[in-house]
Curated annotation (Swiss-Prot):
InterPro entries xrefs: EF-hand-dom_pair, EF_Hand_1_Ca_BS, EF_hand_dom, Parvalbumin
Keyword Repeat assigned: yes
PROSITE patterns xrefs: EF_HAND_1, EF_HAND_2
Residue intervals of the EF-hand domain: 39-74, 78-109
Biological role: Appears to promote immune maturation in bone marrow cells in culture. Binds two calcium ions.
GO molecular function, one term: calcium ion binding
Residues the entry annotates as binding Ca(2+) 1: 52, 54, 56, 63
Name listed for the protein in its UniProt record: Parvalbumin, thymic
Family the UniProt entry places it in: Belongs to the parvalbumin family.
PANTHER family noted in UniProt: PARVALBUMIN ALPHA, PARVALBUMIN, THYMIC
């Protein structure tokens, strides 16, 4: 499954263009612009499955750093500060990674 099966290419392009500069990534505005915030829990779970590159059932810090590349191979990697802030926002149980329920909560926050 491709991310464009769930989200529109136009929305993805718009969301990526808003965070091209280093340290400009904001997960709330990104999720809103890309259209993920308005998706169903099942659709959000499918996006989680795409982001979970190693299929561990969690999005780990290394996968978060490459978050934008899941939307476009030409996108930048997140900075260390962006990655840590993103992880801190999503990791509500403190295990150092984001599970599917945590991701769904983060998207809807």
């Amino acid at each position: 499954m491709a991310i464009t099966d769930i989200l529109s290419a136009k929305d993805i392009e718009s969301a990526l263009s808003s965070c091209q500069a280093a340290d400009s990534f904001n997960y709330k505005s990104f999720f809103s612009t890309v259209g993920l915030s308005s998706k169903t829990p099942d659709q959000i779970k499918k996006v989680f499955g795409i982001l979970d590159q190693d299929k561990s059932g969690f999005i780990e810090e290394e996968e978060l750093q490459l978050f934008l590349k899941n939307f476009s191979s030409s996108a930048r990697v997140l900075t260390s500060a962006e990655t840590k802030a993103f992880l801190a926002a999503g990791d509500t149980d403190g295990d150092g990674k984001i599970g599917v329920e945590e991701f769904q909560s983060l998207v809807k926050a």
